[in-house]
Amino acid sequence: MPICAVKDLVADPAVTLADIARVVGPRRTIDRRLKEDDRLSPDESDRFTRFLGVLDLAAGVFGGRVAAMRWLQSPKRRFDDEQPIDLLVSDVGTRMVEEVLEQARHGFTA
């Protein structure tokens, strides 16, 4: 995936490079890729795509990316007081977060 996808997302004031690095990989690696206009690795691309999908789902549930990021960064009892954003590093964690968001979209408490 081209690094411009990361640049485009960081242009949104709701999302920081630090937020992306929590899911995609080390901040220094992302900074280097940005500086060199490099591509994300396949694993980084996969994690970035998962992050984008969950961010868009949460934005739909909560009415925008600012509220979505607030929710993703708030510890949830349902996740043993982990922040949902930290679960997005794995497929299983991502599915757990998506499940809660889908329930919220259908009227259950997130």
Predicted feature descriptions by range:
Residues 1-110:
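Non-transmembrane "mature" sequence context
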